[in-house]
Amino acid sequence: MSKFDFLTSGDFRGAEEFMEKQKRYGSLKSEELESIPESEIVSAVTSWIESKFAEDWHDMGRVINSLPTPCINVYCADYISKEIRDGGFGQAFFNTSRDFIGIAAEGFRAVGYPKLGDVIEQALKINYDSGKKAAGRSIEDFLAFAANDDYKTVDKDFCRVFDEGKFNRLAKDYILRYKKYFGKAEP
């Protein structure tokens, strides 16, 4: 969940928790990774990555593109899984890009969750075949774009296959395998 999600939700209780994690993990060190619980490690590394963004996140794309591949894989997979679980593939395509979603598919495969990568590839094919692209950025534009049910089946497939516990377990193994890329290294 990004800091901007709290502006559109009525739940500001989670905002404090989000900001506390941002503060705590913004200076994450790679030596700390093994001690972080499985249920929190993805949040820890995404908070560390997001701490590199400017306050308004205008440089998000540049920062993500500058990261090592293992960091990109985990970040994109986590980000897109939240978009899909929150509002389906329609929301994911409206809020991000085909490239970002494609990177998430590769991220799921890299961490060892290929079925999710396959579901995302199906959604990308549907999106390409339909020729539909999000036009505009208003709430009306979003509602019009998201109103189509082209993604109904892949939305259900993603939610059926995705298991947060499994993703966290696979991601922790992956993060520890590539821990030199996550967090600040001790001198």
Task: Show where each model-derived region lies.
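Extended, alpha-helix-rich binding/interface surfaces that flank or overlap catalytic cores
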Residues: 8-75, 81-86, 90-100, 107-187
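Membrane-interface interhelical connector segments
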Residues: 2-7
